[in-house]
Regions:
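Extended, domain-scale alpha-helical bundle/helix-rich regions
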Residues: 27-35, 51, 364-450
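Glycine- and acidic
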Residues: 110-117, 143-150, 299-307, 367-373, ...
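Active-site cores that bind ATP or allylic diphosphates and position pyrophosphate for catalysis
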Residues: 198-353, 372, 411, 416-420, ...
């Protein structure tokens, strides 16, 4: 990298660092700046191995400025960015559209209907976030119904029932009612019997492949014209468990020549030999399909509005046949696209995560590498931050992308004011500190915006620990934050006695550090793996569950303090 390009990198990095720091009211982070910097400046990319070092120096300088100085400097570099910070961003806020026809209902009732086959991943948070927001808006009611009527292919996990309710509470909502579909099997049987007596359902023993062929041709099953008495008798045999899996189903009569083959005489009940894991439901062998169970429940429980994926449009069309037969009015329906979430190497799928846990590749549902709500909660991310990001996606019927950086930015706004600051040095290199101007201790503030919280006292005897990438070139100065200015000479830091003006003038970068002879051993668990380091002694006084910021690294949640050191979970920059 030549000198001209290096200066351009410095200038662009400084703009990004200042903008980032002012926007989030926190110290800038190299990682948060590198992405947009390289994206906007393709000519920097061939020098990707050198750019981080330059950016690190710039970030250090910006970290040493107060808010007013940062703003003044950004105005000098790019007034448009200051104007952007000042602009009213309300027009950019995504708000949920009003629900249709709410005036037609005495009480708005919405439901989330999770399959309890495991704790929730991040994508699951969208439904309770939106439903909870709508019920708050309309003073409505939030219903949870566990759709747990498939004990074989989507086998429920007993622990998941409570885990999902805890996830909903974490997001900030409390359901008004909770149901388990497996408790309501007799209700579904009763409605099946009514349907049979109407002549609108029939038992069918055709192999699935044979029926599919007839369905494609628009040809009815030879079982379709059975009299209701025979159908009811065979259905009762299904209920009694007299058939084996795959031997008999109950079908709803629709239009066998319907233009959409998926709607032709769909299955309402089937036989499953695998017992349900819940003791209360373990004896059942005749199980309703989701479209039947859900359709009946939505009416009986009084759901007024249903939100479901765009890929489930056929469900409403199937269920409409039931509603017509029973004389019911179908709820209002809104469809949306799927959510794609970045920043994870793991497929965001409950079954995939479960397989990785069973294989020992993940430590559990709260492993920081797992894209689950339990994981981000343990990392110190507030449920409110997730809800705000999910609401920001709106209700588009197209697939939408959710950047984890959005959740991180929301969480930063929540925790930044409360999070005290500490130093953590990774891969620390010990460097002697010498010179007559050497202070006895450093006194960095607990929080840059709260002088009333006071300082941390960090005694320095003979040496400090710094990260290898922060060691300046021989003869250059660096500011040890809260301690003072030193010059790197002959593998040592020589205290210079310079005041903070050398940082404000842009001549000297700022780095964090730790005393070499008094530190706390820390293991930081991150989505990219575990990182170890040495924290300043005051970190030992933090409380478990406290959110703190390791300066120039990011926010973490304190998980435990022990004799062998402390464990924290990394939240975000």
């Amino acid at each position: 990298m030549d000198d001209e390009l290096r200066e351009r990198v410095k200038q662009e990095a400084e703009k990004h660092a200042l903008f980032n720091a002012l926007k989030h009211d926190s110290d800038p982070d190299v990682g948060a700046i590198m992405g947009p910097l390289m994206g906007e400046n393709p000519d920097f990319r061939p020098h990707g191995d050198e750019v981080p070092g330059v950016v690190g120096q710039v970030v250090g300088k910006v970290g040493g400025l107060d808010t007013e100085a940062r703003r003044e400097r950004l105005a000098e570099l790019d007034q448009a960015l200051v104007d952007e910070l000042d602009a009213d961003d309300e027009a950019d806020d995504h708000t949920l559209p009003d629900l249709p026809n709410v005036e037609d209902y005495e009480t708005v009732r919405l439901r989330a209907a999770p399959n309890p086959n495991g704790p929730w991943h991040l994508g699951h948070a969208r439904m309770p976030s939106v439903i909870g927001t709508y019920t708050d808006r309309y003073d409505g009611e939030f219903v949870i119904r566990f759709d747990d009527t498939d004990p074989e292919t989507k086998r429920p996990d007993i622990s998941a029932y409570d885990a999902i309710l805890e996830d909903i509470e974490y997001l900030g909502f409390e359901p008004d009612e909770v149901y388990r579909a497996s408790d309501r099997i007799e209700t579904y049987y009763d409605h099946a019997r009514e349907l049979i007596e109407m002549g609108e359902a029939y038992t069918c023993d055709l192999p699935a492949e044979e029926f599919s062929e007839l369905k494609r041709e628009g040809t009815p099953s030879p079982n379709r014209d059975k009299d209701p008495e025979t159908v009811l008798e065979e259905f009762e045999a299904m209920v009694d468990g007299d058939y084996e899996s795959g031997e008999m189903v109950l079908r709803v009569k629709t239009d066998i020549e319907h233009k959409n083959p998926a709607l032709r005489d769909w299955v309402a009940f089937r036989m499953i030999d695998t017992p349900h894991p819940r003791e209360e439901a373990a004896d059942y062998r005749c199980w309703p399909m989701l479209d039947f169970q859900s359709g009946v429940d939505d009416h009986l429980v009084g759901i007024t509005h249903i939100i479901r994926g765009i890929d489930l449009q056929d469900s409403a069309k199937r269920q409409q046949f039931l509603y017509d037969y029973f004389g019911w009015e179908y709820p209002e329906v809104l469809h949306w696209g799927h959510v794609q979430i970045d920043a994870y190497d793991i497929k965001i799928s409950t079954s995939t995560i479960k397989e990785l846990i069973d294989a020992g590749e993940l430590d559990g549902w709260d492993d920081p590498r797992a894209p689950t709500l339990q994981s981000v909660r343990r990392r110190g991310i507030h449920g409110e931050a997730i809800v705000d990001s999910m609401i920001g996606l709106g209700m588009s019927t197209t697939d939408v992308d959710l950047a984890m950086s959005s959740i991180y930015a929301n969480n930063r706004d929540i925790v930044d004011d409360e999070a005290n600051r500490y130093f953590l040095v990774r891969d620390g290199q010990e460097i002697p500190v010498v010179g007559d101007a050497k202070p006895e201790a450093g006194h960095p503030p607990l929080h840059p915006n709260h002088e009333d919280r006071g300082d941390r006292e960090i005694p320095v005897d003979d040496a400090v620990l710094v990260e290898p990438d922060d060691i300046p070139a021989d003869g250059e100065r660096i500011w040890l934050k809260g301690y003072g200015c030193v010059r790197y000479e002959n593998d040592a830091f020589v205290a210079t006695g310079d005041d903070i003006s050398v940082v404000r003038d842009g001549d000297v970068g700022v780095i964090h550090w730790a005393p070499a002879d008094d530190t706390v051993s820390v293991t930081m668990r991150t989505p990219d793996g575990d990182v170890t380091g040495a924290a300043e002694p005051a970190f030992a006084d933090t409380a478990v569950d406290e959110i703190v910021q390791f300066e120039r690294i990011g926010f973490v949640r304190v998980d435990e303090h022990g004799e062998e050191g402390s464990v924290v979970y990394y939240a975000h920059p």
